[in-house]
């Protein structure tokens, strides 16, 4: 009789996993996203890495909205080059609105030419504006609509991180993105604030 219950349990687990939709078009984003409330300083405390060379840690981003309602951002963080050369690098991004207020096209580039540049989707998956935000970008989709190359940041207003309750919420949203256990924590030790200008790009 035990094997019957085991089969029932396996069927239930299989059915639950089959219900999850990992197509990018199915992902929920923040409803009624407010750019003005989102503006200001954010500390990246975890990220899912894409292909290519991006900022690695000590990442601080500042979002701003101009008088015409256009959003832009600057970011600074540490990058390791040639395995042993560490520098602080700056990146810049401008955002184009779409029909969904939480979905943008982000044109970004590094002040230094070796950094990644592109024009990616930039989605705000969730935020409460005051403590946390979860961002997601898919740069390349598979034929079945799932993502082949994505990156995602968990942002906090506090460099010390998030509360346990907020972390649980973020993990739930990461699972909805089919990215559970793919993030790594980002260190903030003041590296780029303490570096001389010759170590910045």
From Swiss-Prot:
Highest rank taxon of the organism: Eukaryota
Disulfide bonds: 22-178, 88-192, 138-147
Post-translational modification Omega-N-methylarginine, affected residues: 139
Tissue expression notes: Detected in blood plasma (at protein level).
A GO cellular-component term linked to this record: extracellular space
Localization of this protein: Secreted
Stated family: Belongs to the calycin superfamily. Lipocalin family.
Pfam families: Lipocalin
Family matches, as SUPFAM superfamilies: Lipocalins
The protein's assembly and partners: Interacts with TTR. Interaction with TTR prevents its loss by filtration through the kidney glomeruli. Interacts with STRA6.
Coiled-coil regions listed in the entry: none
Signal peptide stretch: 1-18
InterPro entries per the UniProt record, alphabetical: Calycin, Lipocalin_ApoD, Lipocalin_CS, Lipocln_cytosolic_FA-bd_dom, Retinol-bd/Purpurin
Role this protein plays: Retinol-binding protein that mediates retinol transport in blood plasma. Delivers retinol from the liver stores to the peripheral tissues. Transfers the bound all-trans retinol to STRA6, that then facilitates retinol transport across the cell membrane.
Binding site for substrate: 116
Gene this chain is encoded by: Rbp4
Record GO terms (molecular function): protein-containing complex binding; retinal binding; retinol binding; retinol transmembrane transporter activity
Keywords: Disulfide bond, Methylation, Retinol-binding, Secreted, Signal, Transport, Vitamin A
GO process annotations (BP): cardiac muscle tissue development; detection of light stimulus involved in visual perception; embryonic organ morphogenesis; embryonic retina morphogenesis in camera-type eye; embryonic skeletal system development; eye development; female genitalia morphogenesis; gluconeogenesis
Protein name: Retinol-binding protein 4
């Amino acid at each position: 009789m035990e094997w019957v219950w085991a089969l029932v349990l396996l069927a239930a687990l299989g059915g639950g996993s089959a219900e999850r939709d990992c197509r990018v078009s199915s992902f929920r984003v923040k409803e009624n996203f407010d750019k003005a409330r989102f503006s200001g300083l954010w500390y990246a405390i975890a990220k899912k890495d894409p292909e290519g060379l991006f900022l690695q840690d000590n990442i601080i981003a500042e979002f701003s909205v101009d008088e015409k309602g256009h959003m832009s951002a600057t970011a600074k963080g540490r990058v390791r080059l040639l395995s042993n050369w560490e520098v602080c690098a700056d990146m810049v991004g401008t955002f184009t609105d779409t029909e969904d207020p939480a979905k943008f096209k982000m044109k970004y580039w590094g002040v230094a030419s070796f950094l990644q540049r592109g024009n990616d989707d930039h989605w705000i998956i969730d935020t409460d504006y005051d403590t946390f935000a979860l961002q997601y970008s898919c740069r390349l989709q598979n034929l079945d609509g799932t993502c082949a190359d994505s990156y995602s940041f968990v942002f906090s207003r506090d460099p010390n991180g998030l509360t346990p309750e907020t972390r649980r919420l973020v993990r739930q949203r990461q699972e909805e993105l089919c990215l559970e256990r793919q993030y790594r924590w980002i260190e903030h030790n003041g590296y780029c604030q303490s570096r001389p200008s010759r170590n910045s790009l």
